[in-house]
Amino acid sequence: MYLILIKKYQYNLLLILMVVVVSLMLGCDSDYTQDDSNLNSALSSDTDITPNITPSVSVKSGSFKDSAVAGINYVSGGETGTTDSDGTFKYEEGGTVTFSVGGVVIGSGPPSAEMTPVDIVDGGSEDNQAVVNIARFLQTLDDDGDPTNGIGISSTTSEAIKTTGKSIDFNVDATSFSENTDVLDVVQKVATQTGREVELVSETKAKSHLQNTVM
């Protein structure tokens, strides 16, 4: 009797067994496909990652001279400050450095170990009028009026200039610079705030001193 029943349901049992086997195979294949997809996704994600590398910047020291000039502000990339008694400033190599006094920008240019007014004017030279006017301005602001021992610009002088809110155009002829109301207002304000006599240094005197500095 059992043999008869087995024969009777033999076909059904084989069919069920085949369905189970196929289902297991499909399940394994699905898991493999999913794992493969996850692996490909991870690899793709890793490939797309770009390292965020910031190039290092070389910071060096230089000196600004018309004699050593102390008390002028400088900006070179992330480097900012005020020159010391040796005219020392810091700069980012390959960038630009800008100098100012009391908010008055005197010039900018490619930085180097030693700079003078010649280096902060496009096409600058000892005879360039803008260069000479910058030298006149800096020598006028010298605290003791004797640029041969260095030019020192005090914080009081810088603050006096800042209160005027003036900007100065150095790219003019000697006469126009001497008569410029902005220049004269700054000179007068410095004299008032420091309590000393201040007169705009002549073109001849400023140029002579500058030439001795550059030589």
Q: How would you describe each model-predicted region?
A:
Residues 11-20:
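Sec-dependent N-terminal signal peptides
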Residues 24-27:
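C-terminal motif of bacterial Sec signal peptides marking the signal peptidase cleavage site
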Residues 30-215:
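Feature for extracytoplasmic/surface-facing segments of secreted or surface-associated proteins
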Residues 1-10:
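N-terminal secretory signal peptides that target proteins for export/translocation
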